[in-house]
Amino acid sequence: NTNIVLASHFGVKGNGIPCGEQCVAAINYIMINGGTLLFPPGEINWGKIRGNFNVKNGPNFKLLGTPGKTVFTFDNIDPIKINKLWGHSEPALITIGSNSTISSEYTSSFIMESIKIDYSRQKNQGGPTYNTMNNGAHPTPYSDGTLAIHIMYADSPILKDIEISNVYGSGICIWKCTDAIIQNVTTYNVSANQVLSADGKNESVDHFGYSIWSGASANTKISNCKAFNYRVYSCDPKLKSPHNNEQYDGKICGYIGIYCEYSPIQGNKNIESIHYEWLSDENTDKRGYAKVINCFVRGYTFGFKSESLMYIHFDNCKAIYNYIGFSIQASALIENCYINGLTIDYERCPQQGIESQRGGVCFSWWSGENNLHEQYLLNSYIESRKYQCISLGKGTVTIQHNTLRIYESAALIKTVTSFELAKVKISENRLIIDNIKPITSPEHIRITNTQKTDFSENYLYNLSNAPCELNISNGTLKNNLFNGNFKYISTTDYCVIDGNTFSDIKNRTTPEFIFLSSKNTHFSHNIIHIHHIEKIKDIIFLSKVTNFSFIKNNIIVDKNYFSENTIENSLLKTFGE
């Protein structure tokens, strides 16, 4: 094929002998002339050379390795002092493109395929040693590490069948690109996270150390990618977080697995996305859109993340052993996903601001109060032992057709911030409480600071002896089936509890409904099963309640049926003023 150029013609060899300059010459040639550059099998050692390629508006090209056999390796370069323009402390291994000054200049469409990258020779491996404690949580004060592949302002770049291993830093960055495709990429121990400053006194909430990041790019698609991280901090156990006094030693060292952030107008607002007319007026919708499909993340502070004017569609993804499985700080649709925190729940996170937000899925908005963000969780499965399956913060949230299963001291759904949510809709879910422990403040479902809550047609099954507590903000609790030991607590301005069924055949407990300083509460058309006639007075408690109505509820004591007319007066118990 006349369009195929052999990299070996430029002196590139797969024998481990440094040939970085030859690699640079070969790639520059193919970017200028077009075609496919075929790399030989074996270890292609770039030495201390770092590839920085910046050919604008050239022909399309392809960088192709021998499948499963071409490995790019690099000799160590020591960290440098971080500057204000870029957070990594070592130059990127391979950079294609650059920040353009005009929209019409960009890197043409290209494919990078069937190439492995290994940086085992990197000395900055993360985690301090005992003789470098003055440098904080890493061997040097400037230890965000490196970036394996940096793609900037490119038209339709495709990274396919890429494997990246042993990089202290980050894997792939797509910056201000259009229609990027990242497919079948696997990373092993590609991670970093300098949570502690060099003086050991300050902490960073936001840093580097990711597998894949799409930043300020239009229409990115990430599919069939996997990020495995087993890197942990290795340091003096006495070194602890100034924030929560948790030790760093042995804890996850990795920030984010896969995430997308920033709208395409981030940075220079005068530079439009390639082929897109993206208005930069402050009053227009500036959101970027991306898809993350069939991906897996293990061993990061955040498994997946959406942030800062992004709308991401996550489909059929799995998050295992991450402090937070999915962190949704903007808009997102999560569907058909699996989040498992059963093992990592036994570890507290030493990074500032994370512990209070923890959950399988964290719906929030850290950058400010913004209820315009739409957040959806559909047809997914979440398990937890200690933290909530779902954390609520801000925005408009829909949780539908999911299975949430908790053990020990975990919770199902909780509000974790003081910001106000516009609307929370929780419907048609299976909520399973399995072997929980009695604790001081159970509150397995707590939805507060919400303008309107719709909790409807859910099936809640409490398999334990301990009671499950529900505290739901203003709105409706309608047509749900509660099986097990339940206690409902209300402090709302308005609430409609209608058409629900409460029973506990296994433990024969009596449900409790407690209304404290509540207003405009309507309790109607519910079916309540109790198993002890003497408990009939212990069902509903009222304190400082105004406008409470009790209409057409059915109470069943074993096989005896009581209508509301015969027991209404004895059923309602008032205390306080």
What kind of feature is each model-predicted range?
Residues 20, 24-62, 66-87, 117, ...:
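N-terminal extracellular ligand-recognition/capping segment immediately after the signal peptide
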Residues 37, 61-65, 94, 315-317, ...:
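Well-ordered beta-strand segments characteristic of repetitive beta-sheet solenoids
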Residues 12, 115, 119-122, 166-168, ...:
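Glycine-centered low-complexity coil/loop motifs and glycine-rich tracts
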Residues 1-24:
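Right-handed parallel beta-helix/beta-solenoid
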Residues 49-53, 77-103, 125-150, 166-173, ...:
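Extracellular beta-strand/beta-solenoid scaffold signature
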Residues 38, 44-52, 70-76, 92-96, ...:
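Beta-strand-rich extracellular passenger or scaffold domains
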Residues 115, 162, 185, 225, ...:
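Consensus "Asn ladder" position of solenoid repeat domains
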Residues 57-59, 108, 154-158, 176-181, ...:
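Short "repeat-start/strand-capping" segments in structured domains, especially the N-termini
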